[in-house]
Curated annotation (Swiss-Prot):
Subunit organization: Component of the TIM17:23 complex at least composed of TIM23, TIM17 and TIM50. The complex interacts with the TIM44 component of the PAM complex.
Designated name of the protein: Mitochondrial import inner membrane translocase subunit TIM17-3
Keyword Translocase: no
Swiss-Prot/TrEMBL keywords: Membrane, Mitochondrion, Mitochondrion inner membrane, Transmembrane, Transmembrane helix
Gene name of the encoded protein: TIM17-3
UniProt-listed PANTHER family: MITOCHONDRIAL IMPORT INNER MEMBRANE TRANSLOCASE SUBUNIT TIM-17 (PTHR10485), MITOCHONDRIAL IMPORT INNER MEMBRANE TRANSLOCASE SUBUNIT TIM17-3 (PTHR10485:SF15)
Main location: mitochondrion
Species of the source: Arabidopsis thaliana
Protein function: Essential component of the TIM17:23 complex, a complex that mediates the translocation of transit peptide-containing proteins across the mitochondrial inner membrane. Links the inner and outer membranes.
GO CC, alphabetical: TIM23 mitochondrial import inner membrane translocase complex
Stated induction or repression of this protein's expression: Down-regulated after antimycin A or rotenone treatments.
Highest taxon in the source lineage: Eukaryota
Family: Belongs to the Tim17/Tim22/Tim23 family.
Protein localization: Mitochondrion inner membrane
Length: 133
């Protein structure tokens, strides 16, 4: 029997799923962070209100930022899976580098290349390409 390892999920489902998870992670983490920060920066009698207001104003924005990152990363990852016809850690490493470069291209070529190297390195640490199987 010839069984090839196929992609776990269809491309669009995979990308939309990553966007949703990234938005949720950013919104929850942003809510906690901005609540604590807002409560700390509020006067003594209004700490709860200040924290709630800061979280409700800033958490969706951070969730959206995470969603863009997750969507680009997943899109590049799926594109590499389709081009290379295999799933391995190199896809996520290159996708992370491409995502880092695209997200910081507005700051110039030097910043984009630095960001690409850093994101690629970060994903190489998370998904080591060489190791035990």
């Amino acid at each position: 029997m010839d069984t090839k390892k196929k992609s776990k999920e269809h491309g669009l489902y995979r990308i939309v799923n990553a966007i949703g998870y990234a938005f949720g992670a950013g919104a929850v983490g942003g809510s906690v962070y901005h609540f604590v920060r807002g409560a700390y920066n509020s006067p003594i009698g209004a700490r709860y209100v200040g924290g709630t207001q800061a979280a409700s104003m800033n958490a969706p924005r951070l969730g959206g930022t995470f969603a863009v990152f997750g969507g680009l990363l997943s899109t590049f990852d799926y594109a590499l899976v389709r081009i290379r016809k295999k799933e391995d850690p190199w896809n996520s490493i290159v996708a992370g580098a491409a995502t880092g470069g695209v997200l910081s291209i507005r700051k110039g070529v030097v910043a984009a290349s630095t960001s690409a190297v850093m994101f690629g390195f970060f994903l190489a640490v998370l998904n080591p390409p060489f190791g035990s199987k």
